[in-house]
Amino acid sequence: MNGTELQQYLYQDRWKMAAVAVEEIDDTIKVMGVLSDKLRIAPLPLMPRSEEGHLAHRIYEMERSTYHEGNIADTLPEEHARTKGRTRSASMNHVPDQFLVEVHVMVDEPHYSMFDRREDLVTYLALTIVLVNMRYGDTSGPNIQFLLTSIQKEEKFARTFPEYDIGWPDANRTYADANTTFEDLLKNYGRSPADITVAVTGLILADGYDPFIKGYAAVRGQARLGGVCNERYSMVMVEDVPTSFGMVSLLPHELGHALGAPHDGLTHTWNECLPPRNECRKNSQNDHFIMHPSEPGNGKFSNCSKEHMTAFISTLSTSCFDLKAKQNCKTQVKKLPGVSINLTEICQIAHPNFLEWNVEPVKKENCRFLCCSRRSLNSYEKTCGLEHFLPDGADCGDAKRCVKGTCGYYDEYGAPTTQRQSA
């Protein structure tokens, strides 16, 4: 499916934070996507049609996962290796008002195999980029937005290892070794056909140390600092539970690294004319901006992160700002994907070894949930996996919805609403 075809039935409303795909099949309308941070909509092809011949749809709730507090090392030690050539005076005159970063997405078999049709995978990835763009909506000088220009299915790119299932210790599962997988990606795919490549694995990223412990699965993505338009490592990597929109909460952070932003509290000089302020060396543990080192939010960037990205972009050549793809996936988004996602189904995909799948909210204010199961049918003892992110639009209780990682009063489009008054 090319960008022109996709554009015909994808709809976006940037202000209302919604993304749905509308497709006409056999004289009926099929709708799939995000209605809110918790609600999703999906067709029910096996259900009878209405008297008017319309295809039945289901609106269901979805919840999400989170960064582990130990997720600090998502940039490799060599992240600063190529920056000497960047630390130079550079003019901003060649930088456009809007930087459209072209994105090539590569997905592995554990991820793409969960989609029945190629069109469904393309739609899901396009909606993901739309929601990532919303996190970059308040960037300026330049405004940064991403264009999905190509998708590649790569059956196996992860270095894997078997270990006990964190959520179900009685069984094993396959993990992707984070460091060696990312090194392989840099070696084999580091030169992107676009401005940046996003490698998405359907496996859990982890450090394959022995003895294996739960904390080794804290890393959920990796990137090199300043990777955009780099000839050797224009690559970021994230994990994602297929259909969950979980990587929407991870990609802004990793792409921020690729655009020159270190973790909050750290500084890097890209342009001697635009040095980082001394205040940027201070890191407040209470300000959970997107580039927080251990507990990132997914709502907005700190001013220091924005300044780092501006300084990095000022060092890029004009060729990086030229659009190289002949077509891309522009989208029009109506409702947020969280409006229609079924969290139980997400738990089934994320935790196939579970005996049953129960969704339990956790840290509602940060929009997260757990997938839990009884250890046996004759026991009340339960086990839970790692936290997941609630997608944009999902219900987080008390008539609130999650939008950009915040539980608040929003409608299904992501627009702020007033608190409902009790009778």
Which residues make up each language-model segment?
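Short amphipathic alpha-helical interaction elements and helix-loop-helix interfaces
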Residues: 15-17, 28, 37, 50, ...
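The catalytic-center signature of Zn2+-dependent metalloproteases
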Residues: 149-170, 231-306, 310-311
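Cysteine-rich modules of extracellular adhesion/ECM and protease-associated proteins
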Residues: 262-423
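Fold-level signature of zinc-dependent metallopeptidase catalytic domains
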Residues: 57, 61-230, 241-246, 264, ...
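N-terminal prosegments of processed precursors
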Residues: 1-46, 115, 168-187, 194, ...
